[in-house]
Amino acid sequence: MFRVERTVEFESWLDGLRDRRAKEKIATRLVRVESGLLGDWKAVGDGVSEMRIDHGPGYRLYYTIRGQVIVIQLCGSDKSGQGRAITLAKELAKSI
């Protein structure tokens, strides 16, 4: 079981999504994460991992785990902004 915490950067990105179906898929994914089901993910380095959402342009949710129970949503992107988002996620992870 995890508790999901979100950064301001993640909330801002999510609020800016116009694709309602994508928002629904992301919300569903985060509920599953709280149940311990991370699904499709991979490590991207420096303690940061990426959850992949197979919808539209390929959404990515970046997170780090602190302790045994907290998953912190750092930021999100689609496939086209992946490089910038990974860099931002790593910077945010260091500041937490």
Name what the model sees in each region.
Residues 45-50:
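Short, hydrophobic/aromatic-rich segments at coil-to-beta transitions
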Residues 3-4, 12, 20-23, 27, ...:
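Enriched for short, Lys/Arg-rich terminal
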Residues 43-44, 65:
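Generic beta-strand structural signal
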